[in-house]
Amino acid sequence: MVIDAGSSGTRLTLYAPGSDLTASRIFRAPLTTPGLSSFVDNPGDAGPQSVTPLLDALRDQLVTTGISPSDVPIALLATAGVRLLKQTDPAAVRAIFASTQAAITASGMPLRTNAILPDVREAALAWVDANALSGTLDDTAPRVGIIEVGGASAQVAFHSPRPRGPGVVQVRVDGRVLHTVAVSYLGLGSNETRSAMQTRLNGGKPCFPNNATGVNPKFYLAASQRRVASDRADFRGSPCGRTYAAVISDVATTVKEPRIRPQRLGSLPGFSRANFIGLGGVTFAYTDFAIPTTADPRRAL
């Protein structure tokens, strides 16, 4: 069982291992609880408020299916929101994980993992998942590349024809060693990027559409993020796009080798052959703007 402690929320999914590379999803909790990084001021509440409600929903499902809780090991994996928090308040992160561990232990289910998922591993695992589901892990098939936009970070990964090189990592799958370029950019997730754009634009009106009625919604963003009144927003593509590019540039200056700056991705071996798909926030953007999902994100990169 996996607890995905993402920056925008915490979710629980129960899987059953399959005979192939995929796993069957048995159950997904019908609720999303607050992200762990939101408990920076009250870390002791992370377990009771973020993890316990999910475990309660799981326990009800286990009773229905006749599965013993002792047979369901729990892996809690936190991602970029907690990575960011660790940079500024490592003590809070330790307290948050102590709280989540206590909640899992109290559930009677065995604890397998309660930690931050390394950023490059997050990118590589997303790549493996996409190719396993697409049936493209075989050497004879063109492999899928992924562009994943989460709440606090963005990941890019694609097959590398070379065993070594910038950003190349080894991934062991079903007894085979695969090579992939896997990179993660902390700060380029949708929430963090939007916050940075708000700061640069002194309020961000050019990045939101005008809603003259002033209802549904009345405001964009929470008050803590310099919210914008929807009837005063004034979307303008050029200044908004320039601001987004500036935020990407800011993040790029913090990337150190062997990490890859975003501007270099297109020159790496394997990039031009990958069939990219968008995950996370990319999918939401396609839906919101009615963009055909066949659009190739490689062109945007």
Name the predicted role of every residue range:
Residues 14, 33-69, 75, 81-146, ...:
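Helical "lid/coupling" subdomains associated with nucleotide-phosphate turnover
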Residues 8-9, 19-21, 83:
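Primarily extracytoplasmic ectodomains and periplasmic/lumenal surface modules that are beta-strand-rich
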Residues 1-3, 17:
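Broad, structure-driven detector of short, well-ordered beta-strand segments within folded domains
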Residues 3-11, 147-153:
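A short acidic Gly-Thr/Ser loop motif
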Residues 19-27, 165:
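Beta-strand initiation motifs
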Residues 30:
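Conserved ATP-binding subdomain of kinase catalytic cores across diverse folds
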Residues 10, 22, 39-41:
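Short, solvent-exposed loop/turn elements at domain surfaces
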